[in-house]
Amino acid sequence: VTGVQTCALPISRDAVPLTAEWAVKVREAIGSGPTLGIDWHHRLSIPETVSFVNRMPRGTLDYLEEPIRAESPAAYAQLRTLIDVPLAIGEEFSSKWAFAPFIEQGLTDLVRVDVCNVGGLTEAMKVAAMAESRYLDLMPHHPLGPICGAATAHLCLAAPNVSAMEIRRSPTEDLGFYDERLFPVQPRQEGPRLFV
């Protein structure tokens, strides 16, 4: 597999078996090397999440991102006892305080900090330090344009516990942020600062 390819999946709950089948086929096609995760974006219940995971052989997914709403650490604690797939949580959290129970209680494996949502690089670095103290990696969320991308890249270079940075430049998701006709001045690195 060269590059990243995306696939739009149905968003109804009937998609659980279809998505599990698709994930198994993708894993078979790409082998065990590349990381494979599914982001349900809070669309499932706890029983649906368990059903989804149980439809796949162990090791199909490297992580499962936010299958249920993240307002309730207790719900994630329950889910944690029912599945063995690593969880990625936090892309919508707006402060270190929202991350604290998920990190302190071991409810997430990959911390999905979003520099823009969490309030900037200083707060993101505090989340990174909290995660590092529990031997957790960051997988920063980056859904926005080039300025957010540059800030997220700075976070990834500054934090010692980053596993991957999300970059969304696929044809199905490109919102025009990188179109040089619309944004002729693109972010670039010039020394140790963010320059746009």
Task: Report residues per predicted region.
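Short, small-residue-biased leader/transition segments that mark boundaries at the very start
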Residues: 2-9
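Glycine/Thr-rich beta-alpha phosphate-binding loop at enzyme active sites
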Residues: 10-14, 61-67
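Glycine-centered, small-residue-biased loops immediately flanking beta-strands
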Residues: 34
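Shared catalytic-loop signature of beta/alpha-barrel
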Residues: 54, 60-63, 71-195
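Distinct, well-ordered alpha-helical segments
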Residues: 14-28, 44-57, 75-80, 98-104
